[in-house]
């Protein structure tokens, strides 16, 4: 039956009305891929006292190291001057002209546009240094492409004494991994072509790393030299003696003298000595810088038993220490190509060498003793064994053992070196000096201590690389304090300790000794003017967990009668006057999952009732993130007092250009005043609107947000 004209008109009006209502939402809500690619980390600051003047904050962030862009915003929707000092571990520094108790947001992701993320903008308050040879006094260290490598033989770094000495400063150091303080595993996973030679260096990278074949630049392989046997014999003469890995049978002798080698046009890796004296090439040998040349690269050697004393194999991929520029340049068949990452090789590192002999039944592997090797085959099977036996040479930093395995149909090799059993010794004093005494943190064989004027303090804990080290000093009257924190990818180690000496103007200072290298990426220091505040009792910082950009975030303090209520899509906090009530009750969230993070311990719960109490102490700063789409709640519990935040007042006469987002016109006459009695959720709404507006440009759509203000 056909609809009459009146009904048709009514139906069209209804459809049109629905479209009009939905249309604004299509602009406000991006695609799922956009939302999912953006996350925010709330940072809660609570002051117990008034603080005048600008403040510089530092905060470690528990976020992945591979994120793209970011910006910092406060709860009023204003962009902040900020700098991401390190991404691994993530460590952010930002400036606030007039600090108050509020919540900040670190927003990051693929679709985020970076804002105020340059040292030029931030240089009003902090100086960031990438190493060069003129600014620093360096002994027993090498600077290459902005990365400083200290070799461990009484290596010392200080600022040039002609540079200004700071009366008060907070020093930041970005320390990359040494060669391998706590080795985990090294991985080579690829089809093994016939005649391949694979050299795996044990270096700064810790963790499993998959290497597709062929190993070329875009795969970011930091420690593989993969060779394929393809070239012909070279013309032999009396001046060419090459080291060769036999393509038909593994060469048993690893000690082959290499007199001076002239440049050869064939691609390959040339080992030579400019002094024309003999060089011994063996696993783990230290090859001087003159042992490499970049104008022609190949690996060659004496062909054993044939009378032919020169031979070459073409490399498909080569990586050597001399070609690293700030961890971003490698050489591929004579051409420099960029890669990503910050890796540092050391010439003294030992090597794991595999010779695949045309998929024979007796392939051989030279690997560290106690390492675990897993060989995978094309039929899906795998074979694992522990490397045992006598070292092929004495005097190596790690005993290397020759082992054999069935080599037909090999598709991958996995070498786990987490069981070296090697005692690697090192001691790093990182901090500052006033030329009378030294201060900072002392890291000895993985254990960290505070270090005050020659006295080693209590142990802070076991630390791992990479890390950020922050060390500073301040005075309260005539009493001087040294404070700092060590930030790793998994933990934060703060400290504050009184100095028995008056601290004079300071400069940067690092003193390192060890059997493995120490790599420093960059250094920052804050301004010398102003006063550092003792943070105990003055301010508390609570860094939340990463949450989706569309999460509702509440910044509250646990207390009897505190309720967080979810009703009809709205979320708000309220206080019920009941001194015997729990310190936090979740109302209306039955079925939600809870992640409770308290003192670095994570607990997972499920909300089983509509009035669900959460067992927490009172007077604890809480960051509560509620994602209604995934029906999940993340509660990050801060401390009543903390020393993990460092502040420094900026002179009052320092001017700061205002950088703010457009102020939206909210429905009704809602006026947000920092001194008003509005609850924290009203402040968050402004931040949320500003964040949404950042994703779509400067225009803010009005009239579709529903606010719930208690």
UniProtKB/Swiss-Prot annotation:
It is found in: Host membrane. GO terms for cellular component: host cell membrane; membrane. Residues 1-33 form the signal peptide. The chain crosses the membrane at residues 41-61, 76-95, 689-709. Keywords: Host membrane, Membrane, Signal, Transmembrane, Transmembrane helix. The keyword Transmembrane helix applies. Disulfide bonds: none annotated. Its main location: host cell. It is a multi-pass membrane protein. This is Putative transmembrane protein ORF710.
